[in-house]
């Protein structure tokens, strides 16, 4: 549910009343938006494709009001079977994937069509307005920082985040996740009860509060024994490691050291240092996450992804959530083209060519600060010392249930803000952004998405940017989005990925 208009709830989370300057900044943001409307929280889809009797993707409601299944059963007469199949209307793209473009995406598409060749110039003016609003809010940013001083680990990764502009975006959009800016000052709950952001699809917890509290207490009571078990496990794995496993351990240590050098986590500490720092009244008040390496790609282009085992550590078990994320379909560009074609038919105009830009949010989960640093400790085996070492992650470990929810709240807000401010049809798959644009936009939608991230100081990764173009190759797909006189987008695996699947 959206926050009540004009309540400035994100700002008030800091315990302050909005100033005249802040109210004016929100007013200017609202005036700059291309449309008005409350965000609709995703709901659980009803029916499944196999439900052919009364609901599901293969059931249609006829003009006579009778529901009929679209699935065609086998028939002894093959010609009759073929004739029946030819008359069946296949599910639409939205019905197949369960994904539909959000209202802000559709508004952006229609606005782009209205602007046409003037789109790049209009977006330049919008960027200028955002820049002016950001400058107007700088004193407010200092005021918010003073009202809620951040813990040291939060300051290290989120000390530069523009809290005032995040608040203004949330309040101007009437965005339901009113606590998001505050969490960048205080840290996000990562263990235990994870507050509902009101952005994603609701789910019912599987355990009541009393039983959950007992479970968490019982797990926390084993912290010391668990640390000993992790050390033994890592020593045993190192002793039994094959050459490929040894190489993975080496790369894993290098990646962890690189994150420490980039200020995303502490440098490695020893077992004794860990115990001294986190022992409270004779008990260990920390739960470590064993970090392991997952190889990705083929020989010659393989890389290691560091994964922290929240399942083995039981950290995920003591995490209680009330919502689950809803990711976009991999066919997002095709969904946008479908909406574009529909809008063009309604206007009676030709369908223009489109382009796709790809971006990546730098450091992803590591940029979202945790409120539970004692649970964000990754254990890594050091081949040189033949001992385990530990890294204190300031953000979120990769492998925790809470990491997924807390991180995705950030790009989700910024996608909607980009659509409303810049008419940029954009969605994200975790930390990967897919930005659609008219060819007439000359890549300005992607440039505006970048400008928005720079303004809130959660910057994108320039090295991973794929500039707006009609054809893109990425590790998981190749898409062609030009020639939209036919509303089609093609997706296929790159040759290297295809070879690995068939080998």
What are these regions (language model features)?
Residues 290, 302-305, 351-357, 424-427, ...:
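Beta-sheet entry/capping signal
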Residues 263-273, 424, 459-465:
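Short secondary-structure junctions
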Residues 404-453:
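Active-site palm subdomain of RNA-directed nucleic acid polymerases
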Residues 244-247, 251-256, 260-401, 405, ...:
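Catalytic-core region of right-hand nucleic acid polymerases
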Residues 358-362, 394-399, 421-440, 472-479:
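Catalytic palm active-site di-aspartate
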Residues 107-325:
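Reverse-transcribing Pol proteins
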Residues 1-160:
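Intrinsically disordered, low-structural-confidence terminal and linker regions
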Residues 387-394, 450-503:
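A conserved non-catalytic segment of reverse transcriptases
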